[in-house]
Amino acid sequence: MKSISNRDKLQDLLTQYYLNTNEKMVFLNSTGEVIALNEAAEEVFADDNDYSQMTNAVCRRCEGYSNEYDIMSCENCFLEALEIGKGSFQVFIRTKDNKIQPYTASYELIDHEKGIYAFTLHNVSPQIQRQERMYQRKMMQKTISAQENERKRISRELHDGIVQELINVDVELRLLKYQQDKDELIDNSKRIEGIMSRLIDDVRNLSVELRPSSLDDLGLDAAFRSYFKQFEKNYGIHVNYHTNFSAQRFDNEIETVVYRVVQEALFNALKYAQVDIVEVSLQLNENNIIAEVSDRGVGFKRGDDPKGTGLGLFGMNERAELVNGTVNIDSQINRGTIVTLEVPITD
């Protein structure tokens, strides 16, 4: 009698759970016909209470589930699997208001004799939204930190370089009015002209580092050719540049990421590789932009984290993630370093 009482109590609890839970519960037979569904599930699947018209209702609403093939895939459908797993998985369901929502789902055979399956859905949208907000805050903090570091670098460049040169020009100009000798006056004037010429170059270089106008006006290939020419002039390192690009243009954010990652990799080669030649390859295929910066320098161990400008060598991957790209770094001691950026492109 006690076991019957416990069974009745359990049955009552399960019934209350079925009726009152926010978890969407659907029971189907082996042909995909809906046998029953709770009120929570009716929000997604039922246009009316006529279950006989709801054969394949799950399939009609399902936009795919996350598997080894893709984030949203119908391949090897869980509804048709020969072996039903006991674990949960992520599935994407189109709701009545035509929105695609992610759910944590389970699909299990609960009655072997009658071939009854239970399909349950738990809404994970709030958790995903919280995770997205946390990720956005984290990325904002990193962006602000990178901006502040860049501002500090520019401030040092201005103070230690350009401002000091301007002070020298100011002093030289003040001294000119006291000079009587014509030849000396000419020599000093030429020296001031030289200082001013260097100042113009410094300002131009700083401007290019901040945001080259050629990148906005002409695209990646033209911007890189101009930058590499200036890089060689300023630092004495020859850049062997290979590309199959011509005049293709891409989303502004993609072009910026490719330009900055290559720029960062070049500066790291300049500072740490101890080489006088760097290879840069920029290739476009059907689905990706692939940028590669390689040197035959001193290299480093994978556990090391050499410092660089801006985001740093390993921080480049975070910038690449903004456009769904990846950065791979391959380095060996005394054999050099290869930095490869891959960015997917869409029409």
UniProtKB/Swiss-Prot annotation:
Query: What are the GO MF terms of this UniProt record?
Result: 4 iron, 4 sulfur cluster binding; ATP binding; iron ion binding; phosphorelay sensor kinase activity; protein dimerization activity
Instruction: State the disulfide connectivity.
Output: none
Cofactor comment in the record? Binds 1 [4Fe-4S] cluster.
- List the catalysed reactions: ATP + protein L-histidine = ADP + protein N-phospho-L-histidine
- At the top of the EC hierarchy, this enzyme's class is transferase
The places in or outside the cell where this protein is found are: Cytoplasm
PROSITE patterns in alphabetical order: HIS_KIN (PS50109)
The record describes its post-translational modification as:
Autophosphorylated.
Q: What else is known?
A: NreB may sense the oxygen concentration directly via the disassembly and reassembly of the FNR-type 4Fe-4S cluster. The iron-sulfur cluster controls the functional state of the kinase domain. Under oxic conditions, the iron-sulfur cluster is destroyed and the autophosphorylation activity of NreB is decreased. However, under anoxic conditions and in the presence of iron ions, the iron-sulfur cluster is formed and NreB is autophosphorylated.
User: What protein name does the entry list?
Assistant: Oxygen sensor histidine kinase NreB
Q: Which gene encodes it?
A: nreB
